Amino acid sequence: MKSDSLKENIIYQGLYQLIRTMTPLITIPIISRAFGPSGVGIVSFSFNIVQYFLMIASVGVQLYFNRVIAKSVNDKRQLSQQFWDIFVSKLFLALTVFAMYMVVITIFIDDYYLIFLLQGIYIIGAALDISWFYAGTEKFKIPSLSNIVASGIVLSVVVIFVKDQSDLSLYVFTIAIVTVLNQLPLFIYLKRYISFVSVNWIHVWQLFRSSLAYLLPNGQLNLYTSISCVVLGLVGTYQQVGIFSNAFNILTVAIIMINTFDLVMIPRITKMSIQQSHSLTKTLANNMNIQLILTIPMVFGLIAIMPSFYLWFFGEEFASTVPLMTILAILVLIIPLNMLISRQYLLIVNKIRLYNASITIGAVINLVLCIILIYFYGIYGAAIARLITEFILLIWRFVDITKINVKLNIVSTIQCVIAAVMMFIVLGVVNHYLPPTMYATLLLIAIGIVVYLLLMMTMKINTYGKY
């Protein structure tokens, strides 16, 4: 099967991620004002509970099944066999997880039971998800367009129908059901690439067992966030969960933008690994340096615009977002870097046990720190706990990659920090004279980009370094 070009894949994924990025920028202000911190907290708390079940139901989707498919793209018979075996394995697992979820919420949940019930639709969406097939065959057009339509549906419902806390159920139902509906086009186009074959039950079992190794990698981004939100909900209040969730939603938008390139590169890097190409190490190093050039200014930019941004975006009830973001902003650099090293090196070369060990230890550290620090410092304790955990993991990752002689371009990184700090100073001065409006924020972003790019060109920053 002929794969789409890397350029085309990046365009389609970039378009989808742009829409995915823009949608929350429109919906979050509406939801924050309609539901308030406590309403946002209820939605976030229930979603983070279902996230633990989704981690199991979606095991292997992004990081394993697409690689299995990528190895079979040139043989239609083998490709078809792999697809149906993976799909059946996923389907049985997800339906079992859904049954477990229903039992848990029936026994333990009294308040807001309907909200928790509707969140369970996400697990049905995970059961039907076949995006891994299109990722493995490097055909991102169909899933990207389908996801764009789904984002449009969510946006329309929020803008037209969400008015106050009585619309909580409608909102949760809408965002959950689109995860099911946006799979329909993927199934319709599937017949172009594969045919129906009998399921090999032995292979289904083998796939299931192998995919379990990717349980923690699959939930890397969500695991620690879920821990923070759940502990906040149990130890603190739904209002604190709402404020923390909204702040982290902004970070997630930035992280999603950075990870677009990462996800598109996985099938290509897998092929490099199979061919034992020496370009794997060089590609990893280049991608890390490019990522830092993008994320360093994002960190300083977020801190600079937040004092005026939160007022028009979240509302005055979310004032705690400003000091919270000052702590959390550095995660825009740390989390994508952690994920890049994990996806483009550790998982590609099958260092799954090492990766799982680091994530498990990180989860324990994060949980212990959350329980201790949230009790004393509330949402700021959750932020500090997450920051410490991610920093420990990053040090661990750097120790791993030094063994294959992957090095950062230190000079370039220092120049980026200098440029970003100068940009931060300029934005701080300009922000002092601007009103807290959307247009002022857009102007600040534009000024920040121009200042940063001019400083980069002045210092003649070398993106790739010497390898």
Language model segments and positions:
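Membrane-interface junctions at transmembrane-helix termini in multi-pass inner-membrane proteins
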Residues: 123-147, 330-361
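Interhelical loop/hinge segments that connect adjacent transmembrane helices in multipass membrane
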Residues: 1-2, 6, 141-144, 168-175, ...
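Hydrophobic alpha-helical transmembrane segments
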Residues: 120, 144-192, 360-365, 379-400, ...
